[in-house]
Amino acid sequence: MQAIILGSAAGGGVPQWNCRCPHCTMAWAGDARVKPRTQSSLAVSPDGETWLLVNASPDIRQQLFATPALHPARGLRHSPIAAVLLTNGDVDHVAGLLTLRESQPFRLHATRNILDSVSANRVFDVLAPEHVARREVALDESFAPVPGLAVTLFAVPGKVPLWLEEGTPEIGQETETTVGALIEAGGKRLAYVPGCARVTDDLRRRLSGVDVLLFDGTVYLDDDMIRAGVGTKTGWRMGHVPMTGEGGAIAALAEVPIGRRIFVHINNTNPVLVEESEARRAVEAEGWTVAHDGLTLTL
């Protein structure tokens, strides 16, 4: 099984288009300590030929261009991407579907809740049903989005997408709104959880023994955005568990047997973006890798 992290940043990427926080300023200036990152997306294949796209980032065209394995390879119209899987309905995970509208057949897999959120916005009707079949996926049931891959979706604590919020949303519920994906091939297991509000005992059980974990690394501390002066929301309010602190991902998963631990979906205000920073060194000392675009894994 091969996996390519197409986009390793949270919504807006790094640098964000209008941001001059310290990390974005470094990225705008070409400072090598802060690599530019596109928005969250993953590609997985059992054979290097047929690929599953997990989440369709607004940056998907740029990501495909940067990834030769995903280039058209034959005929006038072709794509190695045979299926797309959504883990929630966030803008940074669904907006890229609009780029995939050029009469190219693929299957779109998601829970009923997530499919309904896509169907609720008619702009996604540009994905013509004769080309893009929408397939409902039940939680906790294995399915094969492409031959050779077995995928099981499971609920993780989350919240509704920002664009569907009405009033004060409930945060931390485990429903079909936010899911993780356990992807298996050749006896190896990869877990992809780009959004998670808190680590529960059930989540620890599900992740136990996986060969690779790609996990929500949106914020270092719960109040990253407030400290940076660019926002008022905490990680919890956005539905994201912090990396550090009491109840943070590092501490909560420390005793869980996991092969390789990688943070993805990293917000522009997260100090781990700066290579050789105190925050980066602290995370790496705990056995975690900070993802970058193009990071390729062979399992």
Swiss-Prot record:
The lineage of its organism: Bacteria, Pseudomonadati, Pseudomonadota, Alphaproteobacteria, Hyphomicrobiales. This is Coenzyme PQQ synthesis protein B. Pathway: Cofactor biosynthesis; pyrroloquinoline quinone biosynthesis. May be involved in the transport of PQQ or its precursor to the periplasm. The keyword Repeat does not apply. GO terms for biological process: pyrroloquinoline quinone biosynthetic process. Keywords: PQQ biosynthesis, Transport. It comes from Methylobacterium sp. (strain 4-46). InterPro entries: Metallo-B-lactamas, PQQ_synth_PqqB, RibonucZ/Hydroxyglut_hydro.
